[in-house]
């Protein structure tokens, strides 16, 4: 049975993706920021790994043995005073997860983007989503952007 590593699992889309993966028989390992564990209540069969996409040096061991990484991390608004920005959580997090996946020998990488993302987008949200897509496209992994 293939193990899938999921980031952003505690979010709205992430919750649905985890549910679908479990229903289809995948072994699921979720990266969970400390304090957000309750969002995955009811998923008894998943592995929960405490961590942060902005601290990739602590994630390598967690991704080992996984056949795929599904990166669903994203924010709708920034909270710069708390270090939460589009650049960090869309662009840097994607680069981090790709590097960790590559280092761990993961073959498949799935990246969630957003409708309206394109070159020359006017909103910073879409600009950083586009930058993340470009980072994925440049990677050596077998990738899909949704």
Predicted regions and their residues:
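Catalytic tyrosine of NAD(P)H-dependent dehydrogenase/reductases that use a Tyr as the general acid/base
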Residues: 125-126
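Structural motif
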Residues: 3, 67-68, 108
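Rossmann-fold NAD(P)-dependent oxidoreductase module
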Residues: 16-20, 100, 135
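N-terminal Rossmann NAD(P)H-binding glycine-rich loop of SDR-like oxidoreductase domains
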Residues: 2-26, 30
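Conserved beta-loop-beta element that borders a ligand/cofactor-binding pocket
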Residues: 107, 113, 134-146
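NAD(P)H-binding glycine-rich loop region in Rossmannoid oxidoreductase-like domains
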Residues: 36-104, 115-121
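Short alpha-helix in the Rossmann-fold core of NAD(P)-dependent oxidoreductases
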Residues: 87-91, 110, 129
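SDR active-site strand-loop-helix element
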Residues: 7, 31, 72-73, 109-115, ...
């Amino acid at each position: 049975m293939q193990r899938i590593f999921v980031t952003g699992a505690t979010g709205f889309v992430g919750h649905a993706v985890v549910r679908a993966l479990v229903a289809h028989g995948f072994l699921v390992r979720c990266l969970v920021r400390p304090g957000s564990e309750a969002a995955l209540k009811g998923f008894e069969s998943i592995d929960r790994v405490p961590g942060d996409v902005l601290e990739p040096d602590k994630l390598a061991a967690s991704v080992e043995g996984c056949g795929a990484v599904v990166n669903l991390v994203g924010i709708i608004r920034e909270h710069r005073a708390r270090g939460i920005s589009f650049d960090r959580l869309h662009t840097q997090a994607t680069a981090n997860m790709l590097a960790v996946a590559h280092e761990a020998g993961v073959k498949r990488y799935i990246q969630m983007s957003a409708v309206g993302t394109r070159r020359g987008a006017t909103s910073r949200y879409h600009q950083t989503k586009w930058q993340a897509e470009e980072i994925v496209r440049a990677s050596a992994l077998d990738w899909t952007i949704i």
